[in-house]
């Protein structure tokens, strides 16, 4: 839809270095049907900021070109096209546009309600949450209520969105018990993943596989949240993990994540 803005920004190394390209694609691990151009986050942020300020010419299905005067109009166009027709980078930029425009909280949440269901990749989800600085400024009770339906979803990245957003916004002393209680209520076996689980490392990038228990990206999201909580509230986090109903594999991922982080590598995880 806006790929004509993006093609010139693809780095030459991604185009010409097969090993580098394979590494980039392996890190993102997009589903096979999601095309990846090869942009990095700084370039996507730059495009989103430019579109937010000045709008863009978008190409709709049927080669129809439409001049959008604002970032909000571009978002509306994203909402109207089949999400599977978008490049990975376009899905990231869509979320960045929701974050960087000047909107009311109600407008953002309306846009976000359309955006979260198209998340199909950890990087799309996490890039959005990491840049949603507006979430830190809204009423916490209001935002917490908004997240609850996503926690209850049966779709992997809708649940991961709720987890990562909670990690970014609610790991505070007065909210910690609420976050832990919500995490402990997750029914991992009821969450559906589009990724296949395999026992060995995928032979090539973008095969739609993960080498762990499904839904891997929800389990890893919980592990990441807990490792972050450990850095801030070590005793309360250990107490929660020891008394929780979390699956053993999630606890193992949490311990591994804690050991890998420079903030918690010397902190007892359990």
What kind of region is each of these model predictions?
Residues 1-270:
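Alpha-helical scaffold domains
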């Amino acid at each position: 839809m806006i790929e004509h803005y993006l093609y010139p920004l693809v780095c030459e190394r991604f185009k010409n270095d097969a090993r580098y390209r394979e590494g980039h694609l392996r890190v993102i691990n997009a589903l096979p049907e999601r095309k990846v151009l090869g942009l990095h986050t700084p370039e996507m942020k730059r495009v989103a900021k430019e579109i937010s300020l000045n709008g863009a010419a978008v190409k709709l299905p049927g080669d129809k070109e439409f001049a959008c005067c604002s970032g909000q109009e571009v978002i509306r166009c994203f909402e109207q096209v089949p999400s599977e027709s978008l490049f990975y980078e376009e899905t990231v930029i869509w979320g960045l546009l929701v974050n960087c425009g000047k909107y009311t909280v109600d407008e953002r949440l309306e846009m976000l309600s359309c955006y979260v269901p198209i998340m199909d990749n950890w990087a799309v989800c996490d890039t959005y949450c990491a840049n949603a600085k507006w979430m830190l400024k809204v009423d916490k009770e209001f935002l917490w209520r908004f997240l609850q339906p996503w926690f209850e979803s049966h779709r992997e990245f809708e649940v991961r969105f709720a987890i990562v957003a909670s990690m970014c916004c609610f790991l505070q002393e007065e909210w910690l018990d609420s976050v832990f209680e919500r995490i402990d209520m997750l029914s991992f076996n009821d969450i559906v993943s589009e990724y296949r689980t395999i026992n060995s490392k995928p032979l090539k990038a973008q095969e739609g596989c993960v080498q762990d228990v499904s839904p891997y990206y929800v389990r890893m999201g919980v592990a990441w949240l807990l490792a972050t909580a450990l850095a801030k509230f070590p005793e309360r986090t250990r107490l929660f993990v020891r008394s929780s109903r979390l699956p053993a594999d999630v606890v193992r991922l949490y311990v591994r994540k804690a050991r890998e982080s420079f903030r918690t590598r010397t902190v007892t995880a359990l």
